Every structure is written in C-alpha cells, then in structure tokens.
Amino acid sequence: MIKAQQISKYQNGCEKILQIPGIRFAALINNKGRIISGGLSEKITPYEKDEEKRNVLFMEIALDLTMRKEFTNTLGSIHAIVSYRDKVNIITIPHRENFILLSVEPELDSQRIINLVRELL
C-alpha cells in the first residue's frame, strides 16, 4: 500500500513528466490496473475518449506485465516494454510492485523518455 506522502511525490513526478513535449499520458498504476497518481496531459485530446475502455487497457497491461515476470529468473528483469502504434507509443516501466505507464508521440525517442522518467521517479 502506498502512503499519501508517496502518492503526492508520484503525482508531482507525473506532472513533471507531462511537461515534456509529446507526452500525452503519464501515471503510476498498481498491479490491478488502477491509477494511483498522474493521468492525461491537459494539452491533448485523448484518442480513446471512453474512460472505461482506458481502464480496461490499464488492467490488460498490468496482467501482461505480471505474466512476463514469469521469465525473470531465466531472462532477467524487465526494464521497460514499448508498444509502437501508428498514433502513439505506449511505454510501460515496472516500478516496485506497480508500473509507470506513458503514452507518447511516436516521433519521441522512447529510450530517452525511459531514462528521463527513471531520473524523475
């Protein structure tokens, strides 16, 4: 369970990440797919306007990350997962028992963004 002080720290971190041009969404999400802190950039219009569908996506990503962790002993830890789509890149970064989820413009350098996020959080 994350304490209120930690949530505030992560919220501030997500807000800093959202200031980076091209970042559409930045949030800390728990292993059940629920947003702990962060959210959509106020500068963009979301491609998926249905909040329920977005929540289903978060749950699917949480499940996918959990399933991929089964190979940690043989392949090593997951540092990040990047899904390259036509309109956005989705970046998942494991963070303790939770994960950071980012939606970024496709022209951004995903590895650079991952490194910046690790520095901020």
Where are these regions (language model features)?
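Non-catalytic interaction/Regulatory regions outside core domains
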Residues: 1-121
